[in-house]
């Protein structure tokens, strides 16, 4: 493979979808090819995520500036990787990890290392005149089933809902584009239903509606009504998913939500009953990230019926994923590149999940940009699932639109596993 020498590295401060600063990195190669990547930011974060370096200068952006991360890229990182081969991704990422030297990227910042890592991959792909998804992965390409967030709650919205995300999964579609079409129709029907009931149709951080409804079951009933109003059914076209973000309402050893206090055992039973009542096939962060016994009990009780996704539990970290596999906690891993800080480590987490029979779901963050790298990672890795928000807000739609472009470019080679095979 021809060497693709890095000639320049540049970073700048830009804004994410919440109006807070984030870092954007540009890499240029000696042949003139360039790569640009912008890094997202989370609101609901796991305690063991790689560190997002912020300036803590209250005089700028309420302390959330990222000039220190920009300086990391333009200084120590640039000095080390200029002259290196952009086509050797693992070597670049190894340098980034070693330069930082901490367990959680706290010296340089995971926002700095990820920006560089992704921009390097994009520059190399552009140099080879190859789409990023082809550059990152070989073989058959599977389009992901989208987990589309239509109602927001928790820390992603200013309403009374304790659960963070209520999602539809278009498992009955035959193509990705059809999945987006029928989901958009449900989204617009949901808007109409909310309006008729006198609810606000304002949207939350991830583009889903944020009506001031008070219960999980009311949210689920509204979604089912919207599916049926759009001319579809839960039996043939859609299933439901939840991101509970249980760590956000775990306090003093109990789960406090909807005016109740439940033990781990009681919460597991609550989920069991909810799954029996509604067509829910995926539940994310159902237990607090440190409630290992709760996770084990949940997995025993529901692991053969429902996709149980660990986000805060695993934070895209191979050591934590390995522990979860060994102790039989959850059966799926949410993959967020900025939780770990490099592309190589992201793919290692995906591979570890797959090799051990766990599913992997590529995910955005609540603070996003127009960057579409995760769309390419989803296709390149053949994960089969992606979580990137609702069907509003251009920062979310950018990912869906990019996936439709990828599907179009693949033509007949684009595979979308529908129906019961969605978990393949």
From Swiss-Prot:
Location in the cell reads:
Cytoplasm; Secreted; Cell surface
Is Nucleotide-binding among this UniProt entry's keywords? no
What residues does (2R)-2-phosphoglycerate bind to? 164, 336, 365-366, 387
**Record Pfam families:** Enolase_C, Enolase_N
- What superkingdom heads the lineage? Bacteria
Identify which top EC class this enzyme belongs to. lyase
Q: Which UniProt keywords apply?
A: Cytoplasm, Glycolysis, Lyase, Magnesium, Metal-binding, Secreted
Listed under catalytic activity are: (2R)-2-phosphoglycerate = phosphoenolpyruvate + H2O
List the GO molecular function terms. Answer: magnesium ion binding; phosphopyruvate hydratase activity
Q: Does the keyword Secreted apply?
A: yes
Gene Ontology terms describing biological process: glycolytic process
Q: Which residues of this UniProt protein bind Mg(2+)?
A: 243, 284, 311
The pathway to which it is assigned is:
Carbohydrate degradation; glycolysis; pyruvate from D-glyceraldehyde 3-phosphate: step 4/5
Which residues act catalytically here? Answer: 206, 336
Cofactor notes: Binds a second Mg(2+) ion via substrate during catalysis.
Please give the GO cellular component terms listed in this UniProt entry. cell surface; extracellular region; phosphopyruvate hydratase complex
SUPFAM superfamilies from the entry?
Answer: Enolase C-terminal domain-like, Enolase N-terminal domain-like
Known EC number: 4.2.1.11
- Which cofactor is essential here? Mg(2+)
Which family does this protein fall into? Belongs to the enolase family.
Database matches in NCBIfam families: eno
The job of this chain, per UniProt, is described as: Catalyzes the reversible conversion of 2-phosphoglycerate (2-PG) into phosphoenolpyruvate (PEP). It is essential for the degradation of carbohydrates via glycolysis.
Q: What is this protein called?
A: Enolase
Gene source species: Wolbachia pipientis subsp. Culex pipiens (strain wPip)
Gene symbol of the encoding locus: eno
């Amino acid at each position: 493979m021809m060497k693709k020498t890095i000639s320049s590295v540049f970073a700048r401060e830009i804004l994410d979808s919440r109006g807070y600063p984030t870092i954007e990195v540009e890499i240029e190669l000696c042949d003139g090819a360039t790569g640009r990547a912008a890094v997202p930011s989370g609101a609901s974060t796991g305690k063991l995520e790689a560190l997002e370096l912020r300036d803590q200068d209250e005089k700028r952006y309420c302390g959330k500036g990222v000039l220190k991360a920009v300086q990391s890229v333009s200084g120590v990182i640039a000095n080390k990787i200029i002259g290196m081969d952009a086509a050797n991704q693992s070597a670049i990422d190894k340098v980034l990890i070693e330069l930082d030297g901490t367990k959680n990227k706290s010296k340089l910042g995971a926002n700095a290392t990820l920006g560089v890592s992704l921009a390097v991959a994009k520059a190399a792909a552009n140099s080879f005149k190859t789409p990023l998804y082809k550059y990152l992965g070989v073989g058959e390409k599977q389009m992901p089933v989208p987990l589309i967030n239509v109602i927001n709650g928790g820390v992603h919205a200013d309403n009374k809902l304790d659960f963070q995300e209520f999602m539809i999964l278009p498992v009955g579609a035959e193509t990705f584009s059809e999945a987006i079409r029928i989901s958009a129709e449900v989204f617009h029907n949901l808007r109409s239903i909310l309006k008729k009931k006198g609810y606000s149709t304002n949207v939350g951080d991830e583009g889903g509606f944020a009506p001031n409804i008070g219960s999980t079951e009311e949210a689920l009933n509204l979604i089912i009504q919207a599916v049926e109003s759009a001319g579809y059914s839960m039996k043939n076209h859609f299933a439901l998913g939840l991101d509970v973000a249980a760590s956000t309402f775990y306090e003093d050893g109990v789960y406090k939500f909807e005016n109740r206090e439940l033990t781990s055992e009681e919460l597991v039973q609550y989920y069991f009953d909810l799954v029996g009542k509604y067509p829910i096939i995926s539940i994310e962060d159902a237990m607090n990230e440190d409630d290992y016994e709760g996770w084990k009990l949940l997995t025993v009780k529901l692991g053969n019926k429902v996709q149980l996704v660990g986000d805060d539990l695993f934070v895209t970290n191979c050591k934590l994923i390995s522990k979860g596999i060994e102790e039989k906690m959850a059966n799926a891993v949410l993959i967020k590149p900025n939780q770990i800080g490099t592309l190589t480590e992201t793919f290692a987490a995906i591979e570890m999940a797959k090799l051990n029979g766990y599913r992997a779901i590529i995910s955005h963050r609540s603070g996003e940009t127009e960057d579409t790298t995760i769309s390419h990672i989803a296709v390149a890795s053949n994960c089969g699932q992606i979580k990137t928000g609702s069907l509003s807000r251009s920062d979310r739609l950018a990912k869906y639109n990019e996936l439709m472009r990828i599907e179009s470019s693949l033509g007949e080679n684009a595979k979308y596993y529908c129906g019961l095979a969605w978990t393949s």
